[in-house]
Amino acid sequence: MRIQLLLVSTLVASIVATRVEDMATFRTEKQWQQDLQYRREFVKRQLAPKPKSNIVVSHTVSCVIDGGNMTSVWRFEGQFNPHIASEVILHDTSGLYNVPHEVQNDGQVLTVTVKRSAPADIAKVLISLKPVQLSSGQYECRPQLQLPWVPRPSSFMYDSYRLWYEKRWLTIILYVFMWTYLVTLLQYCIVRFIGTRLFYFLQRNITIRFTGKPTYNLLTYPVKG
């Protein structure tokens, strides 16, 4: 019964791990470096000189999820100098992940579009225009998906990210189930086939030594004392 239960648990863990790992978006080392580059560019933009002649009159925001990617468009009307493109910042709620985007500016209409390569699992994207002080400070686009944890530049945290957010822990659980099953099966074989024979062998010798009476080994042949 115990072996059957372990076998069923192993099968269920294998199916769940396979399904979840197939659905997970694995972040490669190249993508990891891109995240760090986005962070560096974000800091550079924060430290860059900011022009003072931008005015926002009105704005509209649209945000959709299309084909597994998030697309959003901010459209601002007003007066914008040519350098405003370098002052547009799109980021998630933590402020650590800079969302890839494109900016178009004709002086009176400023259009900011999230690239189609942006993942759809960002729950909230904020836009900042500096030095323009918008009425609410920031405008947001909020798709209905879970925000991913974006790793900081640390090898330990990167490994933790791959383990948890790419569902590698399910693989580890599967391995634990498999090894537990194999060890339990080995223990069962030892007790069932080797331990039983050894028990009868010792019982026969002890009986002969202390009683002098003949006994029978049920596994092999009758023994005469």
Swiss-Prot record:
This is Membrane glycoprotein US7. It is a single-pass type I membrane protein. The chain crosses the membrane at residues 171-191. It comes from Human cytomegalovirus (strain Merlin) (HHV-5). Residues 18-170 are lumenal. It is found in: Host endoplasmic reticulum membrane. Residues 54-145 form the Ig-like H-type domain. GO terms for cellular component: host cell endoplasmic reticulum membrane; membrane. Its main location: host cell. Glycans are attached at residue 69.
